[in-house]
Amino acid sequence: MGHLDKEGLCTQGSSFSWLLRVLNDGISLGLTPCLWDMYLLEGEQMLMLITSIAFKVQRSLYEETNKETWGPATPRALKGTGRARPICESLHSSLQALTASESSRGPSLLQTPPRVPGQQALSRGDKGISVSLSLPSLPSRRGRCGRIIG
């Protein structure tokens, strides 16, 4: 079941499936590869930004469709193609701002931790680290005569 978001657009349950549908159906061919490149290069942290851009493009296409109903028609083949370059430039500047803010936070958790002195790094051939635990031995249950009880 759909609901209205803060932009006033109807959204379905799965935002990723919605994003795929919008990228395939409603956005120009010039913008779609640019958005997918950003997603593939930057991963999940860019998904919200890409979704926001897709919402804006869908909203402008919706408004354009309403203008066609009430005003002069525009060719459907050109719909959405004029906005591809400014949106990509906006995405690029947003990516630069995101990268700058990430670098100001310090090292990422995904980076390799600093090497401890005296510890060797694992090579590709290592199959894992074997850890041997020495457990304390349980006292034997012997009676006074040396016989095992139990």
From Swiss-Prot:
InterPro entries hit by this protein: Rab-GAP-TBC_dom (IPR000195), Rab-GAP_TBC_sf (IPR035969)
Bias kind Polar residues: ranges: 102-111
Residue stretches making up the Rab-GAP TBC domain: 1-43
Chain positions covered by the region annotation Disordered: 102-125
Domain of life: Eukaryota
Protein name: Putative TBC1 domain family member 29
Species whose genome carries this gene: Homo sapiens
